[in-house]
């Protein structure tokens, strides 16, 4: 009969073996997410052709808890034509600094979270900014979604 290995525990610098590994000490250091027990899904009104054109920061046409999946590819803060095209318009909401850009993303994602039904998912397509060195936009997006808005990270591609 094979000898059973003793369980390992999280150490300061990781662990060499993972069989029966108890990582609870590691995860206990993080704030536990609050998971809603509300399972109410609100109906969506008639969307016509299924498309809504507008600012994702203001989705008043959509009810709370009414969308199962949000797929978004927010504009990048890299000086593209769409940024300069609306930059001269008052109240266009075009950020002038990276911190303002992240605040705008927070507003967009907060509105997306509002319309997500319980158990709904949000898929965000972003790329890092710049090249060697680069700014990890994906890390900033994860921070907003997970730490500020309380979503659970399910994966990255």
Q: What name fits each language-model region?
A:
Residues 1-157:
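Core catalytic lobe of class I
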């Amino acid at each position: 009969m094979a000898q059973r290995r003793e369980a390992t525990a999280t150490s300061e610098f990781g662990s060499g073996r993972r069989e029966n590994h108890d990582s609870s000490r590691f995860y206990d250091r993080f704030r536990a997410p609050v998971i809603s027990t509300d399972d109410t899904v609100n109906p969506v009104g008639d969307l016509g052709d299924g498309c809504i054109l507008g600012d994702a920061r203001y989705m008043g046409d959509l009810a709370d808890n009414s969308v199962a999946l949000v797929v978004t590819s927010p504009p990048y803060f890299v000086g593209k034509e769409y940024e300069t095209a609306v930059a001269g318009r008052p109240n266009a909401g075009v950020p002038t600094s990276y911190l303002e850009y992240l605040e705008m993303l927070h507003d967009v994602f907060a509105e997306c979270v509002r319309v997500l039904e319980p158990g709904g998912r949000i898929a965000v397509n972003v790329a890092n900014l710049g090249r060697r060195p680069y700014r990890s936009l994906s890390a900033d997006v994860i921070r907003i979604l997970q730490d500020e808005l309380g979503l659970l990270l399910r994966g990255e591609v």
